[in-house]
Amino acid sequence: MTLYRTRTYIAADFDHDKDAVDQLHKWNDSKHWSLSFTDAHDLQTSSDDSLPCSIKSSLKYRMDGSKTFVLIVGDHSNSLTKGGCQLCGSYNSHILSCARGRYVDYRSYIKYECDKAVEAGSDIKIIVLYNDIAIDKSKCPLAVRDKGIHAPMVFYKDGIYYWDYQSVKEAFDS
């Protein structure tokens, strides 16, 4: 079955940056904003208690159906380990292999997703949004650090932080 690249894939540290993901969905779902995308995560679901290799297989399927990859970068994005086989109960650290006979991949989910986006090459647009008022590439995974469009999601005015719709919209439109 051929999967057409029509969706937007959103990658983030859902433990720390879910607020930014939720804000993207609010703008997308609102009739008052012109941000519009179809979330690739609607293609296939996987549960949090699945094996990392099963989840990565599902992530790859979603990525293969995406024309845009959006990474939300926060304070922990570049140091995450969740998704690495070394954290799976099926991983045997003595012989460095999977007890289920699956491939061993030490990358976190975010690093895996970034690598897959880069591997897609010109088939996918890469947008890196920072859950902050500034772009800090040291927080960004190496694979996409110098790829695509980078933009802040937040601005600061009169002592208050606000979501920066205009910055995000310009990143999507460029």
Please place each PLM-identified region on the residue numbering.
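Conserved beta-strand scaffold positions in the cores of enzyme catalytic domains, especially
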Residues: 37, 126-128, 153
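Conserved BB-loop
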Residues: 31-58, 75-91, 95-104
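C-terminal interaction surface of TIR/SEFIR-family domains
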Residues: 2-7, 132-174
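Conserved N-terminal substructure of TIR/SEFIR domains
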Residues: 1-69, 172-174
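Conserved beta-strand segments of the P-loop GTPase G domain that flank and frequently precede/overlap
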Residues: 11, 71-74, 128-130
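Amphipathic helical hotspot of TIR/SEFIR-family domains
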Residues: 80-135, 140
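Hydrophobic transmembrane alpha-helix bundles
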Residues: 70-80, 168-172
